[in-house]
Amino acid sequence: MEAYKREFIAFLEEAGVLKFGDFTAKSGRKIPYFINAGDIKTGEQIAKLGRFYAKSYLEKIGKKPSVLYGPAYKGISIAVSSAVALADEGLNVPFFFNRKEAKDHGEGGVFVGYVPQNGEQVVIVEDVITAGTAIRESMEILSHLDGVKVAAVFVMVDRKEKGKTELSAMAEVEREFGFPVYSVVDVYDIIEYLEEDPKNEENVTRIKNYLAVNGAKSV
């Protein structure tokens, strides 16, 4: 495993973003681990998260300009911190996010920040894709921007579990919309990380058992 992936998983665990136990996903599945960017609470943590997203962005896209979109609410801080981290790397990208409820006074509208123009490409930054519902909601919101194309989606973790079909939710989104979905790490990276310490044996077994039932087929 690459060193930055190990560092990222350790960061998620230390920050309380990655938890092990008994949880219920939006899909209704009982899951043995949970990922929640809402547990990032300090400036140091969000700055570090932004640097990991920026590294992933530069590896996958390079210094190709685009506009970062962070869906409310968790995606907002990810978009802002990623834009700052990219600026530190010499790539100055604009960002924007949506309001949950449209504002009918002042500047008004659904979006806050830079509003992409016709022909510009948007990169969506999210914490995780479980069933793909949030991405589909984002696509509906962004469809009101004429001539704007979504180029990619970046998330923290690919859970590698079934979506609506035998494919993963990420693969389903890619197939449905025609753009790539990238993750900093996937669940098998997490398993490899956990296996380095014998005290994690129970969590490793539970995750493997879960994937044996709910794991997606590779494409």
Question: How should these model regions be labeled?
Answer:
Residues M1-V125, T133-V219:
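PRPP-associated nucleotide enzymes
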